[in-house]
Amino acid sequence: MTSQALRPDGARVRIGVVGCGVMGRNHARVLSEIAAADLVGIADPDLAVAEPIATQLGTQAVGDIEALIAMGSEALVIAAPTHLHHALATTAIERGVHVLIEKPIASNPEEGRDLVQKAARAGVTLMVGHVERFNQAVQTVKEAIRNEDILSIAITRVGPFPPRMSNVGVVIDLAVHDIDLIRWLTESDIVEVQPQLSNAVAEREDIALLQFRTASGVLAHINTNWLTPFKARHIHVATRDKYVIGDLITRQVTECSGYRPDGSYSMRHLPVGHTEPLRLELNSFLKALTSDATPGVTGDEGVISLDIAMRCLAGSSANAPAVADFAAAKARKVR
């Protein structure tokens, strides 16, 4: 089900942010800079945290989502802790308020599917914040491999242990980004999952080596951990005719092609835009509200990526195929 487009007259969308953690602050900052958005307020139970942020951005701070909705919010960004996503999004959806939910969509796939169904029944837009899709280095890689016979994808996403306390490990915090990217780049279902997990220094897994096979035959690998002293984000894609390397931090993309019998090849650096990914993500959400376009990441897609991540966490039992219908999710366009 699609929602009725807002603001055909070009007026700004009244939008609020729930949660004043790292991502909530970033969402609020970017929304305050977007002409199409009217940041009506930010909500957090800790007003001592929320009020200085609100003052800096020229908006209001309130203590809960109910107050934010009462201020006339037409849409909300939910950037609260994951275990609160389902309850907060349900409150918004039942009031007819459109929602962008930070990844993962919910604590588990069942809650995620429930939100998708509720949004469909209510006729509101539901988008999931898989921000790496909007990294222009990733978008350049996708364009470079368009119509290519993809053979393999290898993604590295590593860094130091996060300073903030978290109730999840690297699979949900980091690898779920790359599960989404593998599905998006290949436009194919992930049908096999082979995870190797370890908790070297943390209570939850802080090392994950994840292998996948897609329905189209692509072999994919994710290497992620919290043990590397520096951040690194790289993607390597091998196709029948080229090899593409993307650095998601520096946003440099290199394409190797034209392999010759003597082992030589041609190499070129592809042009990459440098717009902040979060700005592109929020613009996609606002466009979905004002033009009835499909949001950049649908609720269905968010649920599928979470389901595959949960299969990885299941350890050895995750060797059972993890089947997800990418084509059906796109066709339904449930938001």
PLM feature segments, named:
Residues 27, 57-115:
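Beta-loop-alpha module in the N-terminal Rossmann-like domain of NAD(P)-dependent dehydrogenases
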Residues 1-9, 67, 75-77, 286-335:
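C-terminal helix-rich "cap/oligomerization" subdomain common to oxidoreductases
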